[in-house]
Amino acid sequence: MGNKKLISPEFRVTVGDYEISEGIEVECFSSKESHMDWCRVELSPQLQGLIQFKDMDEATVELGYEDDFDSLIDGYVRCGDGDYWKEIMIKDDMMKLDRVTIKASFVDCEPQDVIRYVLACAGIEDYILSDENYGKKDLFVIDKRSGIKTIAEVNSSWGISNPFFFQKKVFYWGTKEDQKEMYVLEEGGTILALNKYGDLWEAETIAIPWIHHSQEVEVQHSKYSGIVTVEKTIVRSDDTGAVHMYIYFAGGEQDV
């Protein structure tokens, strides 16, 4: 990836038949703890009312330069009851699980049996589940819960804490996408600032859209050095068009 892309990237938003790269301010949030990734696209007054969209229209947000873009989110428009023509709210496929209602009883079941049923009800076919043996329950009952709450209840009932989320439109439970290479975040290079707030470090970086939560990255900084797991990322633009990225990870005061 060229330095020019990293230093002065551009957002490209596709909603239905529209492709927008100007007149927008963008904020994207991704976290394995919150399950659902989202992106808010604020439209300039010139665009408000001109861009027509409806609930569940397919939408993507990409960041890059010229013809080299990486996807930040690939999901659907969520329209509420407010002035939604002023902004476009995009959420990933977890929105399907949030909107489906589960009422079912499962006999002699493993957690994977329940999750596969929930995914089928939500119309989700691409998934990778942990193949670990967590044991069976004689009876497991769900009474009118959303798909997200049902999967959370599976974790709670079996006493496990498997993260679950979507990446590149694939659902993961207790697993994650295979990582082919590890990226290095360096002081004086990709890292602009590094500070700790509570249990998490916040690394303000140049825009690196191919880094996502649950990936491992190597941090090389005078305040902290080591291999860490990304907990969440925030990418946003300001009214000048500048792009800011924040990468969060857990770690001690120093590991140098």
Where would I find each of the regions flagged by the language model?
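Short, charged beta-turn/beta-strand-edge "cap" motif at the junction between a beta-strand
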Residues: 63-69, 220-227
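Surface-exposed, non-catalytic interaction/assembly patches
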Residues: 98-110, 149-152, 175-223, 240, ...
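Short beta-strands and strand-coil junctions in structured, solvent-facing domains, enriched
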Residues: 48-49, 125, 159-163, 236
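Short beta-strand-centered interaction patches in the first periplasmic/extracellular domains
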Residues: 2, 85-94, 128-197
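Low-complexity, intrinsically disordered Gly/Pro/Thr-rich segments
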Residues: 216, 225-238
